[in-house]
Amino acid sequence: MAELDLIAPGPLTGVTAHPLAPLGPDPVSAIPVEKEDADPLSKSGEETQEQGHDPAELGAPGEEDQILCDFCLGASRVRAVKSCLTCMVNYCEEHLRPHQENSKLHSHQLTEPAKDQDLRTCPAHHSPLVSFCHTHQQCICQECGEGEHRGDSTVSLDAARRNKEVDLRCMQLDLEQKLKLNENAIARLQANHKSVLVSVSEVKVVAEEKFGELLAAVRKAQADVMVFLEEKEQAALNQVNSIKTHLEHRSLEMEKSKQELERLAAISNTVLFLEEYCKLKKTEDTASPSIYIGLKDKLSGIRKVITDSTLNLIQLLESYKEKLQEFSREEEYDIRTQVSAIVQRKYRTSKPEPRTRDEFLQYACDITFDPDTAHRYLRLQEDNRKVTNTTPWEHPYPDLPSRFLHWRQVLSQQSLYLHRYYFEVELSGGGTYVGLTCKGIDRKGEERNSCISGNSFSWSIHWNGKEFTAWHSDTETPLKVSPFRRLGIYVNFPGGILSFYGVEYDAMTLIHKFDCKFSEPVYAAFWLSKKENAIRIVDLGEEPEKPAGSSVEAAP
C-alpha cells in the first residue's frame, strides 16, 4: 500500500523580531493593530529641538500609536517610558523620577508603556491586574489572589505570557504540519483521478478485444459489460471527488485557524493576549489521510474473468453481467477506490463507546445547514442553524447543481470523515427525517433513491408525530421508544457506527443504532416532508430541559 509521505515542516522563514510573529507576509490576514496617519500639521524637527526635546521623544499629534506622558501638558507632551499599574498613569523619564527616588513609591508596579485602554483593572476590586490564575484561566489582582483565588496556582503576567507563547507556537507548528500533509493528500487525490481513468480504460480495451471475437451474438453482452465498468468508474471518481472536497474544506478551516493564531500572536498587550488566548478553541487533531488506489490490482480479477470466460461465452451470454456483478460484490474483485487513513499511534487505541452526555461531548462538532443544498421550500434562519418547511412559499435561492429540486431536503455544510462526531438537533412537527448521506445523492430526481430514506448510502430515522422509525435502502424499521424532542447523533466513522439518542436532562436513551460501511466522507442530512416542520441544530452548550410529559408534538 502506498502511503502518504509525512512531511515535517521546515524552518519557518520571516520570523525575526518576535517568536510568535506571522510566518510570512500575508496581505489578507496581516491586519494592523493601529492605523498610522501622518499629520501634515506636525512640527518640523527644528521647532521640536527648540523646545528642548529630542524629536524621537516627542509624540507627533497624528501618530496614534505613540504613548505619551500623562503629566506633560500642551503640545510638548513627551513619549512615555513606563506605565504604573498602581497609579494607572503613563510617565515620561522626567515625571518617572519620583517613582525611582521616593521609597514610598517603590512598591508600585511599573511596566512598559501601555495605552489607557490597556491599563486593565479588576472589575470586582478596581485594582491592577498583576497575576494570572492557572486554575481559573484568568488575570487577577492582588486582592483576588488573597481572596477567592487563595490557594490557586498563579504566576506573574509576564511568566504566564511566556508559557502561553510557547504553547501557541507549538500550535502554529502543528497546524503548519497538518496543513502540508492535507495539501499533499489533495495532490495525491488529483493524481489518483487520472489513475482511475487509465485503469478502467485498460480493462475496457481487454473487453473490446474479447467481445470482438464473439461477433453479433456478443454485442448485447458487450454493452452490458461496458455499462458495468462505466458505472464502477463513475463510482470511483465520485469517491475521489468527495474525499477531495472534504480535504479542501479541511484546508480552508485550517487556514482560518492559522490566521487566527497569527492574529493572536500579534497582540502586544499582555492582558488582552491572555484573555484572547483563553477564549481560543483548541484545533481538533486531524488524522492525515494517505491515499491508496488498489483499483488496478482488483481490475486484474475482472480481466481474468473476461479472458477465461471467452471459451464458454456462448453458454454464459445470458448471465454474463450477473456473473460480473457477483465478482463485484466480493471484496477480492471490488471495483472501488480504497482510501486508507494513516493515523498516529496515539490515536489508534480503541476507545470505549461513550455512554453519558459528557462523554459524547468529547466528540462535539459544530455543523450548519448548507444553503447551497436547501430546497426552495426550506427557510434557513439563525445563522443556518434552523430550517423550516414553508410550503407553498418558495425562497429565491439561486439554481445550483447541488440544490435539491424535488425532495424538501438539506445537507450539512461540513463533511464527517475519519473521526468520531457528535451533534444534537431539536425537532418540531411530525414528518421530520434526520440522518447521514453521501455527497453523490441525486439532487434533482423524483425517485425514492433521491431521498435520504430510499437508498443504500443513506441512514435516517423518522419522527411522524407519534413514534420513531428507522430507514435504510427504502426499508422501514419500527422503533419502540419514547418520544423525544431533542436528538443526539453520534457518528463513529472508523467503527462504522451511526447512533441516535434521545437527550434528556439526566439521561441518554438509545433510539436506534446503524452498522454502516463508510467508504467516503458523509454529510448530516435532513428531510422536512410536511409544511411547518422545523429542525434546529442545538448549541451543545445548552443544557437539556427537564422531562415533562411528551417531548415532541406533531405539527398542526
From Swiss-Prot:
Residues 163-266, 312-332 form a coiled coil. Its EC number is 2.3.2.27. Phosphorylated by ULK1. Auto-ubiquitinates via its B-Boxes. The keyword Transmembrane helix does not apply. It is found in: Cytoplasm. Homodimerizes via its coiled-coil domain. Heterodimerizes with MID1, TRIM24 and PML. Interacts with Galectin-3/LGALS3 in a ULK1-dependent manner; this interaction mediates autophagy of damage endomembranes. Interacts with BECN1. Interacts with ATG16L1. Interacts with p62/SQSTM and LC3B/MAP1LC3B. PANTHER family: B-BOX DOMAIN CONTAINING, TRIPARTITE MOTIF-CONTAINING PROTEIN 16-RELATED. This is Tripartite motif-containing protein 16.
